[in-house]
Amino acid sequence: MIRHKLQNFVNSLPISPERSCSYYPDRLSQIQYLPLQGKIEKDNLQFFFDSGFRRTGNILYRTSCNACRECLSYRVPLNQFVPSRNRKRLLKKNSDLVVRFGSPHLTVEKEILYLRYQRSRYQSFVIGESDQELLEGMRWNLFGYPENSLEMTLSLDEKILGFMILDSASDSLSAVYSVYDPDYPDRSLGSFAILYSILYAKELGMKYYHLGYFLPGHPDMDYKKHWVPSEIRELDTNDWIPFEEFQKKYADFSW
């Protein structure tokens, strides 16, 4: 009964006007969204994650585009996840890092790192934005709604090399965003942050790790297919099905 009421509530949520897509600028995007006021219960948050929602700032949202269905909600079933040999090498390579989990806490050091990360990784995308504009977005998107959130920091000799914001529901962790120092490419800090937080979720007894949207063939979002085993949310039924099964069913995607 409760899930039925939640589903009816989700179906009634507003849909935004169309705007230029941040992944494909030549396309239009829309989201279905819920502004959060105060703390949301972890069981309810889990229902939203299971329904394909993720969070930015104080907004839970999922894509609801008319002409495109390529933003696929992607999760790792943790009871099946075992680090590969390459993943174990990555853990060993970064074994000198100090990893801490705690409540999200904004510092000047993190702001400076965020700017360096954005200017390095997304140079063409943020070229028209000032540092102040980027930082305002960071503060709202990552630190503006700390309820049910965790921050993981990666440090070397007291210097922060990276941080990651995660949302914690009853049965899963959801990756919100990660930032890392572009001067350490050999460490693969982005992959290390995902791997370490997946293992942390397993330690917590979570069932799933949500990686956000997977866009097959997209230069910035295709990498998620390497985090296996995995499940993709079926848009029409809201069921989560194994990656391989989804791939066969939707052979027209840019796999």
Curated annotation (Swiss-Prot):
Keyword terms: Acyltransferase, Cytoplasm, Transferase
Signal sequence annotation: none
Example of a GO MF term: arginyl-tRNA--protein transferase activity
EC number: 2.3.2.29
UniProt GO BP: ubiquitin-dependent protein catabolic process via the N-end rule pathway
Record's catalysed reaction(s): N-terminal L-glutamyl-[protein] + L-leucyl-tRNA(Leu) = N-terminal L-leucyl-L-glutamyl-[protein] + tRNA(Leu) + H(+); N-terminal L-aspartyl-[protein] + L-leucyl-tRNA(Leu) = N-terminal L-leucyl-L-aspartyl-[protein] + tRNA(Leu) + H(+)
GO CC annotation, single: cytoplasm
InterPro entries referenced in this protein's UniProt entry, alphabetically: Acyl_CoA_acyltransferase, Asp_Glu_LeuTrfase, N-end_Aminoacyl_Trfase, N-end_Aminoacyl_Trfase_C, N-end_Aminoacyl_Trfase_N
Localization per Swiss-Prot or TrEMBL: Cytoplasm
Top-rank lineage group of the source organism: Bacteria
Annotated Pfam families: ATE_C (PF04377), ATE_N (PF04376)
Family of this protein: Belongs to the R-transferase family. Bpt subfamily.
NCBIfam families: PRK01305.2-3 (NF002346)
Protein's job: Functions in the N-end rule pathway of protein degradation where it conjugates Leu from its aminoacyl-tRNA to the N-termini of proteins containing an N-terminal aspartate or glutamate.
Designated name of the protein: Aspartate/glutamate leucyltransferase
Source organism (scientific name): Leptospira borgpetersenii serovar Hardjo-bovis (strain JB197)
Gene designation: bpt
